[in-house]
Amino acid sequence: ASTQQTPAQSPTASPTVSTPVAYVDRPLTASPAQLPPLPYDAGALSKAIDAETMRIHHDRHHQTYVDNLNTALKDQPNLQNLSIEAMLRDLNAVPENIRNTIRNNAGGHLNHTIFWQIMSPDGGGQPTGAIAQAINQTFGNFESFRKQFNEAGGDRFGSGWVWLVRNAQGQLQIVSTANQDNPIMEGNYPIMGNDVWEHAYYLRYQNRRADYLNNWWNVVNWNEINRRFQAASQQQARS
């Protein structure tokens, strides 16, 4: 069944959209797109996610986004020279006959590339450093932030993601995106995000998305999230 999608929006002029977002130091290449290895064993995140879910999620779902993206770009040399981020920021420049394919699969590739990095078997606990201070300033305290983040993830109807972003005004904001849309499509820099597609949690949690959302905090990689927050902040300061 096809999924109705809202039209892609051209991002507003924003310092946050000119920086890579898959990695803090380099853009995500499309020539060709490649599946990144997991930075830990598939069973390493068992505090929140079982090994079989991780293997299926990474080896099958993420690989499918990569394969579909490369197929769509096979006869598009001009697009192959762009980063994934650049394509998603300006979807109107993508030929109409492959626009939704690029939106879904480039988005899926980007989202999951971020997702694997912001989790760690040594993660969890309270945030520290600059991101902790920013969360406290914006949301009052970490518990308030976590509650709002989980509520946004729980309220996402169907498939999608919940994100903490730095918006065009330099403020932290919780947003939810449908399907495989990424916050850069609206001019926001994704600091962290959780996948609320059923394939991310169903083997272990079935329909208990709230339990998954709660347990996920046990593997959140605050060191990487601090790196991402600082990268967004530095880019904004230079602009």
UniProtKB/Swiss-Prot annotation:
Reactions the enzyme catalyzes: 2 superoxide + 2 H(+) = H2O2 + O2
Keyword Membrane: no
Cofactor note: Binds 1 Mn(2+) ion per subunit.
One Pfam family per UniProt: Sod_Fe_C
Cofactor: Mn(2+)
Positions that bind Mn(2+): 57, 112, 195, 199
GO cellular component: cytoplasm
Keywords: Manganese, Metal-binding, Oxidoreductase, Signal
E.C. code: 1.15.1.1
Annotated signal peptide: 1-30
Biased composition annotated in UniProt, kind: Polar residues: 1-19
Molecular-function GO terms, alphabetical: metal ion binding; superoxide dismutase activity
InterPro entries hit by this protein: Mn/Fe_SOD, Mn/Fe_SOD_BS, Mn/Fe_SOD_C, Mn/Fe_SOD_N, Mn/Fe_SOD_N_sf, SOD_C_sf
PROSITE patterns given in the database record: SOD_MN (PS00088)
Region feature (Disordered): 1-20
Family per similarity comment: Belongs to the iron/manganese superoxide dismutase family.
Function recorded in the entry: Destroys superoxide anion radicals which are normally produced within the cells and which are toxic to biological systems.
Assembly and oligomerization: Homodimer.
Name of the protein in question: Superoxide dismutase [Mn] 3
Natural source organism: Leptolyngbya boryana
